[in-house]
Amino acid sequence: MKKRLIGFLVLVPALIMSGITLIEANKKSPLEVIDNIRDEFGIFSVQIGQTDPAITIGMDQTKSEAKLREYLKDNLSREAKEKYKIYILKDDINKLEKEHREYLKANNPNK
């Protein structure tokens, strides 16, 4: 009887710890979640604040912000949703690409 009780007292905490470890291993960071959908939602910038608890996402104005918010709601961990406030900025991606090309052209040291 004592052997069974001791075995039970050893086995239960081990199972609980392995379950917790598996749950923690399956959690993705907010950046991993967002990186998986960059092309689908036209995401061109992501900033995750360390001191300011905010995730700021820049996305193509032709894509659906509502669908992006729904995706984040379904895929971010509960802890991330509680910790971070999410800001989504929409802009014309063609305009941004043009500005980036002009910047590179103006700052190219090999002219």
Swiss-Prot record:
Key word Signal present: yes
UniProt keyword Signal present: yes
Signal peptide positions on this chain: 1-25
Domain of life: Bacteria
Keywords, in A-Z order: Signal
Name of protein: SPbeta prophage-derived uncharacterized protein YolC
Gene responsible for this protein: yolC
